[in-house]
């Protein structure tokens, strides 16, 4: 019985699996037969190649037919120029949305090396319009999609402008257009009114979205392409501009005639109901894209248009060339008014006929001139925070003469002196957002058994967040202001928790607003003394600070003290999600969440709002620069005030060294004439010259001692003296030195 000889190895050759063939098939010891799966793949590839060849042949036939039709209808002159034609021809290799690539369905191992693929740009290129300092991971993907859509819209508008510019440059060569232009490229210049809002169901969905959004932006833009043709410019135009307008209108008429004569090359939809459904779906998608873009732009404008620290500086108005407004030489009126109000409140005292003076002692420890600061608050509300009735007074210290705020805790009996030592740590806490604790003492000056007193810094004109935002209705707080409050409180809590302490007074009634959105936490250290005997777990108390922090933000965002109750909590959070950014919503939810393990801490909050902290730092630096500018103005005014004071000491002095005419002789006479030159000049009609700029300019030149010379005239107009500012400065210094030397000898 004969047996067929078997090959040495039945394994398939790797070259067959990888490349489909083997060069050494006659010498190779492995099998070269294809598996059933490979045979199916080979058949599929052959079928795909045949289909592609058929499609290419059909496309070539269609292109030849179109060229024949266009050549028969067009001019021969249009076929001669090819290199300078700005309009793309159908045979061009440039990709077009209506030109289908012949290798779309080809799948090979080298497909990733194709040059037709989109390049992967750097991730920072998608955020050229700016992003918030902190973006949650849930929002990152949505924001990237919005940025990509905006870039596509900008590219579409730029392409249209470039094509229109190229056409205008070569209009003398092609006055009637090029008959070989595709319908798509002609619609780029003049879109025709089409049904279903201009949406073509045969085009790509993403391409239709981009075209529709670009059209909406053109219609909304005041300098769009359509308005350049249709709307006349009200401003006066030159003759060249008018000629350009007429040429553009002629181009528009030519394109309309060509599009009316040329039949549309787009195939009609076979199923009208399917076409309508697709159009409705596309319209909904487009509306959603537009709404998202508009919402993002509005939110960005709101965040960037308002700063929590408005500037004091005023815009400089120049009345004449080289002249400034008088207000630019002095402090801002608003800043001046704020300082005056604070100064007036520092020295308030009770009227002797005021009935409250009977219940206030004239002296309290080392403080006098007590003035009640919470006389308008009810007695019930004064004790709801600490469990005891409290009252606040302004008092003057006998040691340094400075005002302080003293909070009295009524009805509290101190059980141990260690309770006072527990609050001594607060005296070492110095933070710009914390009202510093200065002293704690016990006194019976109010006539009761004993009361506990806490001495704090005094900030005149301050008010609580409760009285500012919760006692009266108004518009919602700007998100910039909320983030400023959040950053300030976070900074204060970071300092408190790092020192091993707990705040526990994060409440609208205990946070003071002391300036332009500058807040300070008041009443620190009271709970450490009042609840000294209560067992403490530091981590839990610090987490309670974060819970109170979240409730405070939610209360201010809703401007309602009832927003954090059990019945209104879910509605309040929903309101924040609709009114403010996702970042603020996530922070509030994080602070109000109480997990079983791994309690949140202030360090995690700092990481969450790190971007906002940088923004707050920028605001503060800008505000500091503004205050330094105002301070520099007052420094200049102080320098000039010293000069005017010296002139006042010297001029018109009735008697000096037993000489009644001392101020009228010698160098003092020049000083008198210079005083008249500054303040007593008159116009030709006899009216006085009231020029502040002249006074400031003259005094500055005098202080510098410049060599510029001026003409001084006596009052009887009989004497004229030419003198420089440098000489006048020497005269003033010499005369003032005489006065000083005589005083030292006495």
Swiss-Prot record:
- Where found? Cytoplasm
Q: Where is the composition biased (Low complexity)?
A: 64-97, 221-275
Domain of life, source organism: Eukaryota
Say yes or no: keyword Cytoplasm present.
yes
Q: Does the keyword Nucleus apply?
A: no
What segment(s) does the record annotate as region Knob domain? 650-746
Query: Subunit arrangement?
Result: Homodimer. Forms a heterotrimer with a catalytic subunit PAN2 to form the poly(A)-nuclease (PAN) deadenylation complex. Interacts (via PAM-2 motif) with poly(A)-binding protein (via PABC domain), conferring substrate specificity of the enzyme complex.
Say what the protein does: Regulatory subunit of the poly(A)-nuclease (PAN) deadenylation complex, one of two cytoplasmic mRNA deadenylases involved in mRNA turnover. PAN specifically shortens poly(A) tails of RNA and the activity is stimulated by poly(A)-binding protein (PABP). PAN deadenylation is followed by rapid degradation of the shortened mRNA tails by the CCR4-NOT complex. Deadenylated mRNAs are then degraded by two alternative mechanisms, namely exosome-mediated 3'-5' exonucleolytic degradation, or deadenylation-dependent mRNA decaping and subsequent 5'-3' exonucleolytic degradation by XRN1.
Q: What is this protein called?
A: PAN2-PAN3 deadenylation complex subunit pan3
Query: What is the scientific name of the source organism?
Result: Dictyostelium discoideum
């Amino acid at each position: 019985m004969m047996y067929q000889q078997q090959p040495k190895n039945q394994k398939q050759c790797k070259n067959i699996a990888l490349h489909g063939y083997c060069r050494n098939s006659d010498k190779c010891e492995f099998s070269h037969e294809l598996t059933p799966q490979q045979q199916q793949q080979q058949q599929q590839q052959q079928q795909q190649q045949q289909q592609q060849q058929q499609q290419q042949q059909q496309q070539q036939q269609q292109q030849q037919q179109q060229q024949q039709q266009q050549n028969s209808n067009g001019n021969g002159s249009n076929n001669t120029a090819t290199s300078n034609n700005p309009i793309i021809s159908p045979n061009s290799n440039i990709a077009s949305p209506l030109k289908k690539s012949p290798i779309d369905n080809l799948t090979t191992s080298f497909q990733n090396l194709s040059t037709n693929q989109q390049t992967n740009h750097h991730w920072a290129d998608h955020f050229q319009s700016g992003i918030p300092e902190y973006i949650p991971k849930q929002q990152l993907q949505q924001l990237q999609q919005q940025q990509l859509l905006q870039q596509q819209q900008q590219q579409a508008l730029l392409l249209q402008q470039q094509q229109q510019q190229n056409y205008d440059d070569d209009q003398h060569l092609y006055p009637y257009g090029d008959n070989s232009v595709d319908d798509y490229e002609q619609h780029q210049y003049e879109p025709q009114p089409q049904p279903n809002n201009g949406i073509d169901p045969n085009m790509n969905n993403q391409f239709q979205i981009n075209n529709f959004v670009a059209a909406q932006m053109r219609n909304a833009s005041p300098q769009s392409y359509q308005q350049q043709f249709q709307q006349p410019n009200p401003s006066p135009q030159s003759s060249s501009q008018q000629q350009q307008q007429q040429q553009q209108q002629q181009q528009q008429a030519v394109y309309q005639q060509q599009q009316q004569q040329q039949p549309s090359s787009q195939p009609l939809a076979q199923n009208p109901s399917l076409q309508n459904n697709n159009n409705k779906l596309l319209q909904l998608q487009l509306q959603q894209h537009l709404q998202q873009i508009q919402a993002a732009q509005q939110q960005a404008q709101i965040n960037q248009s308002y700063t929590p620290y408005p500037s004091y500086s005023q815009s400089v108005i120049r009345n004449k060339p080289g002249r400034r407004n008088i207000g630019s030489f002095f402090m801002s009126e608003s800043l001046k008014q704020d300082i005056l109000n604070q100064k007036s409140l520092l020295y308030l005292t009770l009227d002797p006929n005021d009935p409250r003076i009977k219940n206030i002692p004239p002296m309290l420890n080392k403080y006098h001139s007590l003035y009640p600061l919470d006389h308008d608050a009810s007695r019930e509300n004064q004790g709801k925070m600490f469990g005891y009735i409290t009252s606040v007074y302004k008092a003057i210290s006998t040691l340094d003469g400075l005002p302080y705020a003293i909070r009295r805790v009524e009805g509290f009996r101190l059980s141990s002196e260690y309770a006072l030592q527990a609050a001594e740590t607060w005296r070492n806490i110095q933070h710009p957002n914390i009202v510093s604790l200065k002293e704690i003492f016990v006194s019976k000056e109010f006539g009761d058994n004993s009361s506990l007193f806490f001495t704090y810094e005094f900030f005149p004109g301050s008010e609580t967040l409760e009285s500012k935002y919760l006692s009266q209705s108004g518009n919602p707080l700007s998100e910039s202001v909320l983030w400023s409050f959040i950053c300030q409180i976070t900074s204060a809590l970071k300092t408190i928790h790092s020192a091993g302490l707990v705040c526990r007074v994060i409440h609208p009634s205990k946070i003071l607003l002391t300036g332009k959105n500058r807040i300070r936490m008041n009443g620190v250290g009271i709970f450490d003394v009042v609840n000294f005997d209560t067992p403490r777990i530091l981590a839990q108390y610090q987490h309670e600070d974060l819970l109170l922090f979240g409730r405070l933000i939610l209360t201010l965002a809703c401007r309602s003290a009832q927003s954090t109750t059990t019945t209104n909590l879910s509605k309040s959070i929903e309101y924040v999600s609709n009114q403010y950014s996702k970042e603020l919503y996530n922070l509030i939810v994080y602070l109000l969440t109480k997990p079983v393990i791994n309690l949140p801490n202030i360090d995690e909050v700092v990481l969450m709002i790190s971007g906002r902290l940088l923004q707050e730092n920028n605001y503060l630096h800008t505000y500091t620069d503004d205050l330094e500018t105002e301070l520099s103005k007052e420094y200049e005014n102080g320098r000039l005030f010293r000069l005017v004071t010296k002139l006042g000491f010297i001029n018109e002095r009735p008697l000096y060294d037993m000489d009644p005419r001392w101020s009228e002789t010698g160098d003092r006479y020049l000083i008198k004439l210079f005083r008249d030159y500054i303040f007593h000049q008159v116009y030709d009609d006899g009216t006085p010259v009231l020029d502040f700029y002249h006074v400031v300019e003259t005094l500055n030149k005098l202080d510098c001692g410049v060599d510029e010379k001026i003409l001084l005239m006596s009052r009887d107009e009989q004497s004229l003296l030419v003198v420089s500012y440098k000489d006048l400065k020497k005269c003033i210094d010499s005369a003032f030195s005489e006065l000083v030397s005589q005083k030292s000898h006495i």
